[in-house]
Amino acid sequence: MDLCVTIKGVSFLLQAGLGILANALVLLAYAHIRLAEARLQPVDAILCHLALVDLLLLLTRGVPQTMTVFGMRNLLDDTGCKVVIYTYRIARALSVCITCMLSVFQAVTVAPAAGPLLSGVKARLPQLLAPTFAALWFINMAVCIAAPFFSVAPRNGTVPPFTLNLGFCHVDFHDNLSYVLNGVAVSVRDFAFVGAMLASSGFILLLLHRHRRQVRAVRRSQGSTMETRAARTVLMLVILYSVFFGIDNVIWIYMLTVAQVPPVVADMRVFFSSCYASLSPFLIISSNRKLKARMVCATSEQERQAEDGKNSSGKN
């Protein structure tokens, strides 16, 4: 196997494998917390949903891409391509939407209650989570409904113009107008959510700066400490998303200017567009004491059960 192909395959394999494992661990840890405490905090519920969406994204894009790089062909038929591409498009859209939702939610949470309106919104935030999740799923399922109509299994021969060659599937837009309109629509949606995300994150950053200046004059409570820690986690997630979003869109804008996209360019975009989904769970785990405590607890429990099993076997 060619060295470049090997490096590319190993990169995709590590990205998909570690990302899937980390997102699954986050989901399992939050499931354990939900069973133990009977409820999740609003920020935890959003992070749990983000891990679910990122897991779907890696399963529908990272895994097929890795298998294709290692030479596996004819993975999916037309129906399989339609299902996988549609699910991927929804997961990708939800990833930016939920990250934006997390940033806006945290901005409202840390904002000082300046009046009855904001106080009322703050009080209702936990009740608004479920309807917001449902609305985001419904809207993105409707917006991405055109994706299956352009998705087909790869055909023998050359790739037609205005076609995104994903390796395991082709997304054939047939003409330049459909190709450009799709690209512009996706970019406008993403930039709108990223703009809201950056605006709310800037507001959080301003509040944290003010808090740091006033911290010697104001007694710090446990609640404010937890809010500050959560706000910093949100800021790090937004920065992480913005970096890879920028790289992704630079490549995407280039792809819109050419009728035939070189495979190496398409592979680069796939890799960078999946980096957030694979790295964000590590950031969530490293900055969330509750998650780390649950994982340590689960590991200790497994070790204790294994030790008890060995002792029982020795007695027998």
Curated annotation (Swiss-Prot):
Source superkingdom: Eukaryota
Tissues expressed in: Highly expressed in the olfactory rosette where it localizes to a subset of olfactory sensory neurons, mainly in the apical region of the neuroepithelium. Not detected in other tissues tested.
Extracellular topological domain residue ranges: 1-8, 61-97, 154-187, 255-264
InterPro entries per record: GPCR_Rhodpsn_7TM, Vmron_rcpt_1
Subcellular localization, as worded in the UniProt entry: Cell membrane
Family matches, as Pfam families: V1R
Membrane-side (Cytoplasmic) residue stretches: 30-39, 119-132, 209-233, 286-316
GO biological process: response to pheromone; sensory perception of smell
Residues bearing carbohydrate: N156, N176
One GO MF term: pheromone receptor activity
Function: Probable pheromone receptor. Shows high specificity for 4-hydroxyphenylacetic acid. Activation of the receptor stimulates intracellular calcium release.
Family, per entry: Belongs to the G-protein coupled receptor 1 family.
Name of this chain's protein: Olfactory receptor class A-like protein 1
Species: Danio rerio (Zebrafish)
Lineage: Eukaryota, Metazoa, Chordata, Craniata, Vertebrata
Gene name per UniProt: ora1
